[in-house]
A protein has these predicted regions:
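Structural signature of tandem alpha-helical TPR/SEL1-like repeats
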Residues: 49-61, 82-95, 117-129, 151-163, ...
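Helix-start (N-cap) detector for alpha-helical repeat units in TPR-like alpha-solenoids
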Residues: 36-37, 70-71, 104-105, 138-139, ...
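TPR/TPR-like alpha-solenoid repeats
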Residues: 79, 113, 147, 181, ...
Length: 290
């Protein structure tokens, strides 16, 4: 499962607005706040420069200087989450909520971190709180959809993804996961529409190409399926499933030499990824292609 992460630039634009609002709110200005805010802004610049560890240090120092400065905790959480440090990130988002109880984005990202840490029940509570505070927050609706999909509440997931699309129509991950649920529910035409929308938004969306190819393959449309699997592999050269699926198409077409070539690529990738089961499955298919 892929938990949604805003692109860094979008996060930064939101956070800069939040920081600006804090700077002009007299009730939030203390003797410590100006240097703390300076550190937050310094941290944001470091993130833009790709200096994540230095940014974390700046955000942490800002939070230490002014524990009530919510953007310091929030940015610290985002940076820690980029390093896949889920528990420290969740702790930072929680501190942001304590500092600013109406901070919907902090609730949404805390929910996302908890979901990524395999704690869907707590995640759902924080995501619902985010939506209560800010009903048009696409991030929260999207992650709530992921929770519902994990709970196999398929119609609930579709409803959450659809709402997320209403508020964040340009985010390809939402369309992709909507397509996944539609495909699981055998609503194939809706799945195709969703995957194509994801690809339109992000042409190199490997998983969307792959799922579209899988649908084409199941429908017996071998050439369109092969084209989709090729696009998936071009978008992500380490996508072993795309090579394996292309091998299945070549086998069905009777092009065994081509099948062996891509299946060997798939086997090598599965071995590199230490996926012994699929390495063995691919080896069996290779034997059939000889």
């Amino acid at each position: 499962m892929t938990v949604f992460r805003f692109k860094q630039q979008l996060y930064l634009s939101i956070l800069l607005l939040i920081c600006a609002q804090l700077l002009v709110t007299p009730s939030r200005i203390t003797a410590q706040t100006p240097p703390a805010v300076d550190l937050v802004n310094q941290g944001l610049q470091l993130v833009q420069q790709g200096k994540l560890q230095q940014a974390i240090a700046a955000f942490a120092k800002a939070a230490s200087l002014d524990p009530k400065l919510a953007p310091a905790h929030y940015n610290l959480g985002l940076a820690l989450r980029q390093q896949e440090k889920l528990q420290p990130a969740a702790d930072a988002f929680y501190q942001a909520i304590l500092a600013e109880p109406q901070f919907a984005l902090a609730y949404a990202n805390l929910g996302a971190a908890l979901l990524e840490g395999n704690n869907p029940q707590q995640a759902q509570a924080y995501l619902q709180k985010a939506i209560e505070l800010e009903p048009n927050l696409g991030l929260a609706h999207y992650n709530l959809g992921l929770v519902k999909a994990q709970q196999q509440d398929w119609q609930g997931a579709i409803a959450s993804y659809t709402t997320a699309l209403k508020y964040s129509p340009d985010l390809p991950e939402i369309s992709y996961h909507l397509g996944v649920v539609y495909r699981q529910q055998n609503e194939i035409e809706q799945a195709i529409i969703a995957f194509r929308r994801a690809i339109q938004l992000l042409p190199n969306y490997a998983e969307a190409h792959y799922n579209l190819g899988a649908i084409m393959f199941a429908q017996g449309q071998l050439q369109p399926a092969l084209a989709a699997f090729r696009q998936a592999a071009q978008a992500n050269s380490n996508y072993a499933n795309a090579y394996y699926a292309a091998g299945l198409v070549f086998m069905r077409l009777g092009q065994h030499q081509e099948a062996r070539r891509v299946l060997q690529d798939a086997k090598n990738l599965y071995a590199k990824q230490r996926n012994a089961q699929w390495e063995a499955n691919t080896d069996q298919l290779l034997q059939q292609a000889r």
